[in-house]
Amino acid sequence: MKNNISMKDFYEKYNNEELTILDVRENHEYAAGYIPSAQNFPLSSLGIEFTKLDKNQKYYVIYQAGGRSARAYDFLEAQGFDIINIEGGMNNWPGETK
């Protein structure tokens, strides 16, 4: 069972806590606008890049619309990471972007 968080709840946490956010969109999508503290880990290279992540850290995963972040979630969870999928993705992000 996936550990999901609504955009509303995520945004509230984002404004009150320091969260580690993985934006799994491709580089060109990320460059077009991203959550200021998000790290870019494109889904296409996640199978290699995941080794740079800390298994003792909780990660919030986001994509454009939420669908592909579920694939990243499944992969990272299978590797033993603590993952939370942000429902709705960047299409529903209410805050500012860089």
What is the predicted function of each stretch?
Residues I62:
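Short, surface-exposed ligand- or partner-binding patches at beta-edge/loop junctions that are enriched
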Residues M1-L19, N27-K58, G67-K98:
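Rhodanese-like catalytic fold shared by cysteine-dependent sulfurtransferases
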